[in-house]
Amino acid sequence: MRNAELIFIPTPTVGHLVPFLEFARRLIEQDDRIRITFLLMKQQGQSHLDSYVKTISSSLPFVRFIDVPELEEKPTLGTQSVEAYVYDFIETNVPLVQNIIMGILSSPAFDGVTVKGFVADFFCLPMIDVAKDASLPFYVFLTSNSGFLAMMQYLAYGHKKDTSVFARNSEEMLSIPGFVNPVPAKVLPSALFIEDGYDADVKLAILFTKANGILVNTSFDIEPTSLNHFLGEENYPSVYAVGPIFNPKAHPHPDQDLACCDESMKWLDAQPEASVVFLCFGSMGSLRGPLVKEIAHGLELCQYRFLWSLRTEEVTNDDLLPEGFMDRVSGRGMICGWSPQVEILAHKAVGGFVSHCGWNSIVESLWFGVPIVTWPMYAEQQLNAFLMVKELKLAVELKLDYSVHSGEIVSANEIETAISCVMNKDNNVVRKRVMDISQMIQRATKNGGSSFAAIEKFIHDVIGTRT
């Protein structure tokens, strides 16, 4: 009987909501006592997100969705950092969520169901007071990796000694527990270089320490060093390595162009195995004209087949590409807009991935055994790139500290060199490591695997043993 309810509070963005929904699916499939209620906060311009939830809800039995009323006065992004804006948005929603929780807890239990605890996105840590008022445990679901968590732990403890923002161009090297190598300050999340973003992240870092536990979208196979570090931290919340939280048969991205998707997949079907490099820079990775031209020149130089998911903020692709480019690469290259990233990475023709290093994208590429070329753009992606290249030896370095707002132009020669390195099949150590990790993490999610066991432990801790 499903009589144990968990309240899930995700950040209302696709990149955070999708793994949240998949984690809900895992819990429901793994334990027949659990049902889940999602509280969905409302932002402007999220109709695509509402449609996605409506589409996927039919495939999630024992999950219900409750809309949090829209704020009468919404925080505005203005000159704020994104992190500061999101923190303000979540904090402003706390009273609305509190009212919903009071209603749930005061209503007669339906079918004997008891609310057992909260699971909230790390941006939603201000909701911890709602859980405390209800005398319920509060767990954080971190859609990123344990390296990021180690950095946040460092930030929480370091804040007591130093309350100043980091310098973007600093050559400082940080000794962060959980990392093997010194971490360059320049690869820290971009928010930490801006005063209000720094303040928001420090507040989140301190709130992490007050949670009952932290569920992380990673596994011991991917990040043994940082996860072993947390095993020895008696005064820090329990860390559960429950990843990879990823469904290779998931519903399409809500912004996906289905016609373009079909065309891309048909083109891949005609290509030899592991012969295509896929380039995609995420939902916010729009590129400027000069950079588009350098990428195009780099693709011409390297001579490998390519599929390029190109999104720009300027005019049309034809106006940005070098004159005659499509004619010169005819037959070995294709450009599309929105692409079905999961399906593309799963395709046997794809042998490499030039990525912005969002953690969801990294998880997908590792799952399918596709090695990455690192080209971070924003948020914590620079730290992810450093983690993948220097700590884990699972990626080829193009850039580690690139920022989409820097104005830096990456040269065609640099691009050609990195792509040639990742696509080279002779003595490719990174490719072999990635393929080995792929097999290991797929085993980890099955009964008897480490991630499956971590979910079991979380269920035991929040719900208890079966009676």
From Swiss-Prot:
Transmembrane segments: none annotated. Its EC number is 2.4.1.-. InterPro entries: UDP-glycosyltransf_plant, UDP_glucos_trans, UDP_glycos_trans_CS. Keywords: Glycosyltransferase, Transferase. It comes from the Eukaryota. UDP-alpha-D-glucose binds at residues 283, 339-341, 356-364, 378-381. GO terms for molecular function: UDP-glucosyltransferase activity. The keyword Glycosyltransferase applies. It is an enzyme of class 2 (transferase). SUPFAM superfamilies: UDP-Glycosyltransferase/glycogen phosphorylase. Belongs to the UDP-glycosyltransferase family. This is UDP-glycosyltransferase 71D2. The gene is UGT71D2.
